[in-house]
Amino acid sequence: MPYDIHHEKNYSQDARSVYDAALKSAGELKGQMLSSSPNDLRFEVKFDKTILGKVLGDRTHITCVVQSAENGSKVVVDAYPLDAVGRKLMFGARKGVTQTVIDMFTTHLENNLK
């Protein structure tokens, strides 16, 4: 089972609007912003084991990049689990946690675009 997950999704909205919605989504999920580059439409965020009261079991690191695409924009998300010190977890991660965080992030992003 791969711990690193790569996820891409296209949206009809322009890249700046999608980037702003993605930032808002990370904040709504109580993510800790590690770095942000508004000019490059890119940010990195760390999520704790518990998101919106749901205990997931692992911390998760997400890198989100919004790119201009035909008829809108594309969101590229790369995510992986973290250990207690904040390093990339190479073994022992709980199954499905990273994908669950990506799904929650994507759901909030899409709600913020409405």
Task: Label the predicted regions.
Residues 1-114:
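Ser/Thr-rich, low-complexity intrinsically disordered terminal regions
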